[in-house]
Amino acid sequence: MEGNSGGAAGNDVELLCKTLQVEHKLFYFDLKENPRGRYLKISEKTSATRSTIIVPFTGISWFLDLFNYYVNSDEQELCSKELQLDSKVFYFDIGENRRGRFLKVIV
């Protein structure tokens, strides 16, 4: 995951914060608000790196719908998808390596 909010973090107010640990990775879900509006900040932290994407508030339900598609669909049906929200395009893709399958989200 990669990206940035494009704004000054000093004006941001944290409305909700949740943390999820999956194997050796930590995922942070922060609902925040600044003068431009609300947004969801999703960060993935490993021992060496931290990657972040910002989802505009108006697109959170669309983002979650696509995420659920990958979680609940049969392996054979899965294909790459993209989601345009405001001026951002999110690319969803399934990857696989020696440790297993994963969902890759790129902005």
Regions found by a protein language model. Give the residues of each.
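Positively charged, low-complexity terminal tracts
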Residues: 1-107
